[in-house]
Amino acid sequence: MPSGLTMKETVSCGGVVIYRGKILLLFINYRNRYEGWVLPKGSVEPGEDHEETALREVREESGAKGKIIEYLGSCEYEFNAKEDTVHKTVHWYLISAESFFSRPQKEEYFVDSGYYKYHEAYHLLKYENERGILEKAYNRYQTLKKDGRWT
């Protein structure tokens, strides 16, 4: 870690949201500094458990409502922000959406959203760690659907 920077630990939760085999993605454009397609996720608020955070963030960022099917795992990464090096852990959940409805949260710099076929979503995603979670989630979805357990 470069001198002068402090380490800040953060925890976020998010969802791979699926409806009728298609995956929800959001397009973020943060002041033209970075942009790309991402999965919905966000920070844990006081008093929330990880499942509550994942469902709230999906609803806030995309307008989509759904239910958690299962925990997918976590990923960790670091980035620099102002005077800190941020170490972020993201817990991911497989979520079944109620419909194809989505409305990007403009206040958080999301400018588009939609449901995409797996291969489209995989290639659209900006971050490699999110592509890995998407692959795991879609494999579980296919297994659950084949076994008649996808709801």
Where are each of the predicted segments found?
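Charged, low-complexity, helix/coiled-coil-prone segments
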Residues: 1-6, 36-38, 70-71, 75-84, ...
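N-terminal strand-loop-strand
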Residues: 2-39
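A generic structural signal for ordered secondary structure
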Residues: 14, 19-23, 50-51, 71, ...
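Unchanged
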Residues: 44-132
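Charged phosphate-binding loop/patch that engages nucleotide di/tri-phosphates or the phosphate backbone
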Residues: 123-151
